[in-house]
Amino acid sequence: MTAFNSVPLSRIFRLGIFISMFVLALLSFPEIAQAQWQATVGAQSESLGRQALAFLPNELWIHTGDNVTWTFDSDEIHTVTFQRAGQIRLAFQVGCPGFAADGSGSFNGTTCLSTPPLTKGQSFTITFPTAGNFKLVCLVHANMTGVVHVLDPSQPLPHQQDFYDDQAAEQRKSLLSDDHDLEHRHDSGHDHSAMNTVMAGIGEVSANGGGFQTLIVTRFMEPTKVIHAGETVEWTNFDPLARHTITFGVQPVNPVAPVNTTRDTDGALHGIVNSAADNVHSGVLGAAPQDQVSLPAPPPGVTRFRVTFPNPGEFPYICAIHGGLGMKGKVIVLP
């Protein structure tokens, strides 16, 4: 007891403070070492007619062990997918193959990781245990990419979460802005002033340091056409990426293949709608993919669809892919 009493109380007090600070530092270390980052997948206008196919932002710098949560913010489906280097891209219905279905996963570059197609309000968290630069893709949309730079904890990070929040907001605003004025572009190289024509969607692809971002307009421009019996309406898809359909009657289970159509000499598909009970479907309309070195050149894409209406009536149509976003129209046929 004598030895203990000889220790000054001030020294014991300082030692207690030091121990408390040390314990607090240990408790806070895991939070610093395993930071939680936030990003967004997709964006849309209030009407759903403009869809940003983009990771917002599409470039992040984090430390090994950190988590990133992607929150989906559009009614258009997307995936968050990290593939192995050199892996062949698979369809979004297939996944990597397979999907991580429990809302979280881990990616170290050796095994593919993908969410299933998700929509507004859903989220997915990925842990990155290994340093590296990892490409982020959406399996639904080819020109929707990003990158996550995973650094060793000894290296400083260039940005914090507030920077990414601001960048995401700026990119969202830029993509969805009316400044693009896409809806008022015209097909100057294909003059059909004497015909009834409809622009079946339009879009624009942009790029930054993280990859590609895309705006698509999921609308038929001038969707209601008034014609006379025996006349023909022509739809053209102006979008460089998105596929659309023109569908009368029952929507097919597989939207890719056309139903009750023939092919005109210029490659456009052609259907005839005699009554509201007819089922006529364009199949997917879209531009051909870009030519690539060492791969066979793809044939021209099918971008146009024509329908002749022999009889009077009202004939509603829809895009079988984006009808849920409001991509619909109507042809009114007068005698």
Residue ranges with predicted function:
Residues 1-13:
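N-terminal secretory signal peptides that target proteins for export/translocation
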Residues 10, 15-19, 259-260:
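A detector of low-complexity, intrinsically disordered, Ser/Thr/Gly/Pro/Ala-rich segments
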Residues 16-28:
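Bacterial N-terminal signal peptides
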Residues 26-36:
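Bacterial Sec-dependent N-terminal signal peptides
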Residues 34-335:
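Extracytoplasmic copper-binding redox domains, predominantly the cupredoxin/blue-copper superfamily
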